[in-house]
């Protein structure tokens, strides 16, 4: 039995155990720009409308992040880029990223997290500080997800 049939929801429902199909209904996936570049067309492997998180790893340029978000959005996916607080230097940078994701990729959702770096690059140290800035509200973002690691994150 094939466990992970991503191509279309109807194909998955017909060829997989119903319990597995129910379990996978509404799944999401995460990519990084460098790994997304290895996939010719995500529509060949994921159902349209799948939520795709775009991981922002320290050292990845915002241009690469926005380009990946734009591509995924144009292919019909619900893009949710990471906003790692410790990589974002100040409110101006946060507002620039938000504007670029919205303007260039049509993004309305975000995953807000502290980020995998030990020392903040600037003013922000936590996801709460990004939320409290009000930048996402002012921009009209529709959904904000928050990730946390109360036990610590070794990334």
Task: Label every PLM stretch briefly.
Residues 3-155:
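Active-site beta->alpha loop and helix N-cap motifs at the rims of alpha/beta catalytic domains
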